[in-house]
Regions:
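CN hydrolase (nitrilase-like) catalytic-core segments centered on the catalytic cysteine
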Residues: 1
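ATP/NTP-dependent adenylation/nucleotidyl-transfer catalytic domains that generate, transfer
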Residues: 6-59, 64-320
């Protein structure tokens, strides 16, 4: 364990990466350490904040699936509910996957389509402002319709709403303010997307059965806010993105082995066609997304350097 020390100014000294790395010092596998940390963190947070029940928007994707599985681990199936909110761009498979997931977890799943809500809002917007909603604005409207629905559920029934964004998305701003960022706590905000996949597989292995359907783990990540949309249409592939982020966001706060791997990966990427541009683009996205992170709910920390007090950057700055 690490020890908090007072500095000469009377404030606690920052906890360094080296200090934090001593926490899982009993030979615990990394994914099991993450599982236990998140489960304990949620259980403690909910108790101290007076919440007994949890609600999560279930998209049929891996982030919401893992969040639901961890919530059930922390508070029990009777205290967790999912809400699936299909739109015009939601695949039938996503709804079916949500049904299968919640059946495996033993939790109740509500279905609340947002098609009519989005259509009505878009029509009224055009009538008032003379321009139709299209492109990113229409995509974000769907995310905000879901976020508003979930917050209303939270208000009406007293459930704690969990956000489902992971560290990869949070780093580069691949999220919608007042949409999928709505909630009271984020469980995955310090896990990279590649770790989300790894922890999901570990959850199934730990349970000895398929809690998270394999089809959810295998499917290409997608926000499903536009026809045929995939995450890698907008971002580098997650194995590439995550190594850049480890090098840029956490750097030497990482273990020496993990930092050496990330640094070598980035160095090799620089030598490839388009590599320098990819690295620069990711760095710019991280800087420009600070304003989103400042408005996001608190996120449980499991890695050497988390956003928030672990990485303080100005919101308004010239990043070109």
């Amino acid at each position: 364990m690490y020890t908090l020390e007072l500095g000469d100014d009377g404030h606690f000294k920052p906890v360094t990466g080296e200090q934090f790395k001593t926490v899982p010092a009993q030979g615990l596998p990394t994914m099991e350490f993450y599982r236990q940390q998140i489960v304990l963190g949620l259980r403690d947070y909910a108790r101290r904040c007076g919440f007994k029940q949890i609600v999560v928007g279930s998209s049929g994707g891996i982030d919401s699936a893992l969040t639901l599985a961890l919530a059930v681990d922390a508070l029990g199936a009777d205290n967790v509910v999912g809400v699936t909110m299909p739109s015009n761009y939601s695949s039938a498979g996503s709804v079916d996957d949500s049904v299968d997931l919640c059946r495996n977890l033993g939790i109740k799943l509500y279905e609340h389509p947002i098609k009519e809500l989005v259509t009505t809002y878009a029509r009224q917007f055009e009538a008032s402002f003379g321009e139709p909603l299209k492109g990113l604005a229409l995509e974000n409207l769907q995310a905000r319709a879901r976020g508003t629905t979930l917050m209303e559920f939270s208000n009406a029934f007293g459930h704690l709403l969990l956000t489902t964004g992971n560290k990869s998305e949070v780093s580069v701003g691949y999220c919608t303010l007042y949409g999928d960022t709505n909630g009271g706590l984020g469980l995955l905000g310090d896990l990279y997307k590649t770790e989300v996949f790894e922890l999901s597989r570990h959850i199934n292995a730990h349970a000895g059965r398929e809690l998270i359907p394999q089809v959810i783990i295998d499917k290409p990540p997608s926000a499903e806010l536009a026809p045929g949309q995939r995450d890698d249409d907008s971002l580098p592939p997650y194995p590439v993105l995550d190594e850049i982020l480890k090098w840029h966001v956490e750097g030497k706060h990482l273990s020496s082995k993990e930092y050496a791997h990330a640094a070598e990966f980035v160095e090799q990427l620089r030598k490839q066609a388009g590599g320098p541009e990819t690295i620069a683009r990711v760095q710019k996205l991280v800087f420009r997304s600070e304003y989103k992170r400042r408005q996001a709910p608190p996120m449980l920390r499991v890695r050497p350097r988390a956003f928030g007090t672990g990485r303080q950057m100005p919101i308004a700055a010239h990043y070109e």
